[in-house]
Amino acid sequence: MITKPDKNVIRKKRHNRVRRTLSGTAERPRLNVYRSNKNIYAQLIDDNAGVTVASASTADKELAIGGGNVESAKQVGAAIAKRAIDKGYKSIVFDRGGYLYHGRIKALAEAAREEGLEF
């Protein structure tokens, strides 16, 4: 019997391969994206200190307004960019988390760029 491999296992392998070379610093934190079935989460992470600098998600009360999945991702991207700029971060490293740069991930990244983040 042929079994299909679990998509999340493949994504995690892909993410680990990318993470070997990708790292966030205090000057240029890593923007990590996680996509679940219901929500999308974004974190700015300083990997040297092991600290989350800022975060935003559709689980936040002010961002849980709704709309479509892509519209919600745009709101999260704008919110994480605003929070990053408020804390003094203009340039970041984008970590798509092993997901394809398409749909919700692309919408979040483009909204963050429109708000002024550079990556």
Swiss-Prot record:
One of its GO terms (cellular component) is cytosolic large ribosomal subunit. It comes from the Bacteria. The keyword Glycoprotein does not apply. One of its GO terms (molecular function) is 5S rRNA binding. One of its GO terms (biological process) is translation. The keyword Ribosomal protein applies. InterPro entries: Ribosomal_uL18_bac-type (IPR004389), Ribosomal_uL18_bac/euk (IPR005484). Keywords: Ribonucleoprotein, Ribosomal protein, RNA-binding, rRNA-binding. Pfam families: Ribosomal_L18p. Disulfide bonds: none annotated. Part of the 50S ribosomal subunit; part of the 5S rRNA/L5/L18/L25 subcomplex. Contacts the 5S and 23S rRNAs. HAMAP family: Ribosomal_uL18_B. This is one of the proteins that bind and probably mediate the attachment of the 5S RNA into the large ribosomal subunit, where it forms part of the central protuberance. Belongs to the universal ribosomal protein uL18 family. This is Large ribosomal subunit protein uL18. It comes from Oceanobacillus iheyensis (strain DSM 14371 / CIP 107618 / JCM 11309 / KCTC 3954 / HTE831). The lineage of its organism: Bacteria, Bacillati, Bacillota, Bacilli, Bacillales.
